[in-house]
Amino acid sequence: MADLEAVLADVSYLMAMEKSKTAPAARASKKVVLPEPSIRSVMQRYLAERNEITFDKIFNQKIGFLLFKDFCLNEIGEAVPQVKFYEEIKEYEKLDNEEDRLRRSRQMYDAYIMRELLSSTHQFSKQAVEHVQSHLSKKQVTATLFQPYIEEICESLRGDIFQKFMESDKFTRFCQWKNVELNIHLSMNDFSVHRIIGRGGFGEVYGCRKADTGKMYAMKCLDKKRVKMKQGETLALNERIMLSLVSTGDCPFIVCMTYAFHTPDKLCFILDLMNGGDMHYHLSQHGVFSEKEMRFYASEIILGLEHMHTCFVVYRDLKPANILLDEYGHVRISDLGLACDFSKKKPHASVGTHGYMAPEVLQKGTCYDSSADWFSLGCMLFKLLRGHSPFRQHKTKDKHEIDRMTLTVNVQLPDAFSPELRSLLEGLLQRDVSQRLGCGGGGARELKEHIFFKGIDWQHVYLRKYPPPLIPPRGEVNAADAFDIGSFDEEDTKGIKLLDCDQDLYKNFPLVISERWQQEVVETIYDAVNADTDKIEARRKAKNKQLGQEEDYAMGKDCIMHGYMLKLGNPFLTQWQRRYFYLFPNRLEWRGEGESRQSLLTMEQIMSVEETQIKDRKCILLRIKGGKQFVLQCESDPEFAQWLKELTCTFNEAQRLLRRAPKFLNKPRAAILEFSKPPLCHRNSSGL
């Protein structure tokens, strides 16, 4: 029966994988719904205060670029060929051979440079033109051939064109998408969890599918009780920090994180899914690798380490078991549990796996940085070639002996190794950090320029164009079955209680990596959601002519901000009423949908603006003269933060002005008021 369950779990997992490749959006069981266009008023202020509304910030975001491009191609009343030219340059940079680059560069020169030169409409500098002409005439077509144009294209777009974009519906749509992104609160309900694919010291790893996009991920779940039992809280939090550091920027050679969230019992990392097994497994199945095969893996791992070191992260646990293969055979570095940020302070702890740890890591109290990873790389490459660590002769398991050899023994390399390989390994396995390859100030560049990698096109490596020496079997789960992986003994943690102070440790644990979320959305549901939203907004406008006119009411007035909020209402104070609010320097106005009559509350009548909670939801509490209260709730985190800030600032400024104003200005004004009794007290029929 257990065998049948394992087979069914494998089949379900493989089917989910296949469907996620062909039509991930079709597999989505939840729907992403964009907020109404009126969200723009709040989101524009929210983003502007965080310096997120600049040309560079929007243009360099995936969704921002697509909306800006759509605006330039379809909505602006003038031709904007620069955007297409920019896209062509980006595609050109991905080309991996000189012949293709030469052909494409000539086509681009004819289409975007020569044609404009002939018609005297070329907007770019003479230096940029001459740079391209000079290199083309010599057939020097590097990936950076058009780089001067990238800078000038961006400069030409950031002025009037960007300002027009900011005034367009496409910027409104950008605000709608950003509101969704900044209001993500993940739970287990947002994923379909499939079979277990691995287990570690604190928890398990599962294959999973994100419900709203259909994209497949790996979900690493750490048991909070087990973490507490092993006093691993610092390690768990450190892994989340390290993953957040290395998961920004495009690095295809690290298992990156897209999300982190937690439940009452688990800490969850949502990571790149790697289906090809690990190098330790393949070493046992395939046997040792040749120099040529090892060179392939070394080159990809070097780029992964280079990315980490650029982020000032030292990995500290490089070994075959932590190198995972994807379904095509390319590799990524996984498990950053022992990684460390050395940007401000160098680590000195002795952590890692015996047989791969650098001498300076083993010497207690000695500080180190990225140097440790280059030594570990030498140990790992030796194992791929010989089947064992250079300091683990005759399969000894004595950790002290392994450490002693690491600190004292000069590795004897086999005669069968080529001179180039011997030079590489001797450089990496230097005990003296100052003499070690990669530690002379050049970092990964020192390895890239080593004779062992002569002839390697590193752009080719980055684009994963070299054929992998080993391709994992298709249609198989390259992981042990659930029975072999095993499970934790629940008795171990039976006596462990999670207290409020334990949960407080993880209050800042949730995280969304913006660029990775946007990439996921664009690959899956972006076009479909935009199309659905366009239809919904068109239907709403046709049904209610007042919709879309909220901003018209605010224009020409001193309105600070406007948008929807929920107001606690009805005689029994149990119902949230959705109203459209306008904040002015001296008052707060609102009206219901379809209502022409405005209600208002003056700043003179407010005694304080406070944050409160009702049923675990953050709310804004306005205390009103006479002992009454006015309670508001927002539909997203950014809205709540901005409304609370703007109401507080407006109230404080109004109070300051009222204290300075002559007494006759403080006479009560007639106003249409709506109040509610304190919602946390005994309720009665008085109030709204």
Swiss-Prot record:
The active site is at D317. Its EC number is 2.7.11.15. Belongs to the protein kinase superfamily. AGC Ser/Thr protein kinase family. GPRK subfamily. GO terms for molecular function: ATP binding; beta-adrenergic receptor kinase activity; G protein-coupled receptor kinase activity. Residues 558-652 form the PH domain. Ubiquitinated. This is G protein-coupled receptor kinase 3. Interacts with GIT1. Residues 191-453 form the Protein kinase domain. Specifically phosphorylates the agonist-occupied form of the beta-adrenergic and closely related receptors. Residues 54-175 form the RGS domain. Residues 1-190 are annotated as: N-terminal. CDD domains: PH_GRK2_subgroup (cd01240), RGS_GRK2_GRK3 (cd08747). It catalyses: [beta-adrenergic receptor] + ATP = [beta-adrenergic receptor]-phosphate + ADP + H(+). It holds the Pfam family PH. Residues 454-521 form the AGC-kinase C-terminal domain.
